[in-house]
Amino acid sequence: EVKSSAVLGIILAVVILFVFLRRLGTTLIVSLAIPISIVATFNLMFFNHLTLNIMTLGGLALGAGMLVDNAIVVIESIFRNQEKGMTIREAAIAGTSEVAGAVIASTLTTIVVFLPIVYLHGASGELFKDQAWTVTFSLVSSLFVAILVIPMLYDRITGWQDRGAGGGTR
């Protein structure tokens, strides 16, 4: 049931992204970034001895949502710079630099809200500790993916499309 729900969630996310972004390349970039972020989160969870349960799945969902938000902000900034006449690589660097502060600030703010839950005592602390750690790991992973992986994917995927359309090589 979890597997089919995850697949359905990914399909719905991709369809909604395509409807609103209206560009196949950017939809593909975000679609590739989501599993990268989730795998990075799984690694952090593994090394901190967290298991996959309903609480940690909720944390993963929140982190994936924040990744999509951050990714769209970064992609739109890169796209806007590319429309100004910059090369794809220049647009990726400039666009990411322009919004990096805002993306980092919004992600860290959400982390600061969830991380103190780790220090709760009693039953509520035991209940929500795994979720708080998972949200934190997921948000940290999504931040790195949005700042480092998204610009690289944008350069590679849209650069490949441009070269295929007669744009030449770099």
Question: What do the PLM-derived regions correspond to, one by one?
Answer:
Residues 1-170:
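Hydrophobic regular secondary-structure detector
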